[in-house]
């Protein structure tokens, strides 16, 4: 019986996609500005596999609001063309965690940033039964940043990712833009 309970606990624990490590002391004002999506990863292949996949979004700009929320401007392929979206990520008691109601996700979590070159974040849907997790590595310039990619890969090691995409400088410039 103890073995059965242990197996059940381990199975249930493995199903949780909750990100536990977020950045401490995030200064929301310093993330403002233009960003490029350098790499993406997701817990479910269908979230990123096609150009119009639900979480294959290209972050364009982050804008802190006077209330401490975060406005996220992004581009996404819809109906064969590039569409601009605006998401308001509402602040929570934890500086690096924001609440959203968009793209079927319910949280944005900032994992790490140096503010000048890169920002790592994840979008999480912890609701049953469609738990999902998608993360991105953003950079300030349309150039490949090996250090940022290294940090992204390190952050992903503890997460259940099943697909990962990276973009070269030409692809960064050609990302869905209006």
From Swiss-Prot:
Q: Does the keyword DNA-binding apply?
A: no
Record-linked Gene3D superfamilies: 2.40.128.20
Q: Quaternary arrangement and interactors, per the entry?
A: Under physiological conditions beta-lactoglobulin exists as an equilibrium mixture of monomeric and dimeric forms. Interaction with LMBR1L which mediates the endocytosis of LGB has been observed in PubMed:17991420, but not in PubMed:23964685.
> Which interval of the chain is the signal sequence?
1-16
- Record-linked InterPro entries: Blactoglobulin, Calycin, Lipocalin, Lipocalin_CS, Lipocln_cytosolic_FA-bd_dom
Provide the disulphide bond pattern: 82-176, 122-135, 122-137
Give the Gene Ontology MF terms in alphabetical order.
identical protein binding; long-chain fatty acid binding; retinol binding
In the UniProt record, what gene is named as encoding this protein?
Answer: LGB
Maturation and modification: Alternate disulfide bonds occur in equal amounts in all variants examined.
Q: What does the UniProt function comment say about this protein?
A: Primary component of whey, it binds retinol and is probably involved in the transport of that molecule.
The entry's localization annotation reads: Secreted
Q: Which organism is it from?
A: Bos taurus (Bovine)
- Family matches, as PROSITE patterns: LIPOCALIN
Q: Which family does it belong to?
A: Belongs to the calycin superfamily. Lipocalin family.
Q: Tell me which tissues or organs this protein is expressed in.
A: Synthesized in mammary gland and secreted in milk.
- How is this protein named in the record? Beta-lactoglobulin
A GO cellular component term found in this entry reads:
extracellular region
Q: Would the keyword Secreted turn up in this protein's UniProt record? A: yes
Assigned keywords, A-Z:
Allergen, Disulfide bond, Milk protein, Retinol-binding, Secreted, Signal, Transport
Q: Which Pfam families match?
A: Lipocalin
């Amino acid at each position: 019986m103890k073995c059965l309970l242990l197996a059940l606990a381990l199975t249930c624990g493995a199903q949780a996609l909750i990100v536990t490590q977020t950045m401490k002391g995030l200064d929301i004002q310093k993330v403002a500005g233009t960003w490029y999506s350098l790499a993406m990863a997701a817990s479910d292949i269908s979230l990123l596999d096609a150009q119009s996949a639900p979480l294959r979004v290209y972050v364009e700009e982050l804008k802190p609001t006077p209330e401490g929320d975060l406005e996220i401007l992004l581009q996404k392929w819809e109906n064969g063309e590039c569409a601009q979206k605006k998401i308001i990520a509402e602040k929570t008691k934890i500086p690096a965690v924001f609440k959203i109601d968009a793209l079927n996700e319910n949280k944005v979590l900032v994992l790490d940033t140096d503010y000048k070159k890169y920002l790592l974040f994840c979008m999480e849907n912890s609701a049953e039964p469609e738990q999902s997790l998608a993360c991105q590595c953003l950079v300030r310039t349309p150039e490949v940043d090996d250090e940022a990619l290294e940090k992204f890969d390190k952050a992903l090691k503890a997460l259940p990712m099943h697909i990962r995409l990276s973009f070269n400088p030409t692809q960064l410039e050609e990302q869905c833009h209006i």
